[in-house]
Swiss-Prot record:
Residues 32-45 have a biased composition (Low complexity). Keywords: Repeat, Stress response. Residues 1-52 are annotated as: Disordered. This is Stress-induced protein KIN1. GO terms for cellular component: cytosol. The keyword Ribonucleoprotein does not apply. The keyword Protease does not apply. Residues 1-13 have a biased composition (Polar residues). Induction: By cold stress, abscisic acid (ABA) and water stress. The gene is KIN1.
Length: 66
């Protein structure tokens, strides 16, 4: 193999490895974002549930929940 072909081959290998690493990092970032989204969604539900409980408490104490 000529030196030019060898260098081109090695450059192709390096580019392929870099692309694979970037794909792995993107997958990890997607997984982290999905996990954060699920956590935020659960936190939002908890806040909503707590607020609803607070409203019901006030209604009970003020006699509006009849």
């Amino acid at each position: 193999m000529s030196e030019t072909n060898k260098n081109a081959f090695q450059a192709g290998q390096t580019a392929g490895k870099a692309e694979e690493k970037s794909n792995v990092l993107l997958d990890k970032a997607k997984d982290a974002a999905a996990g954060a989204g699920a956590g935020a969604q659960q936190a939002g539900k908890s806040v909503s549930d707590a607020a609803a409980g607070g409203v019901n408490f006030v209604k009970d104490k003020t006699g509006l929940n009849k």
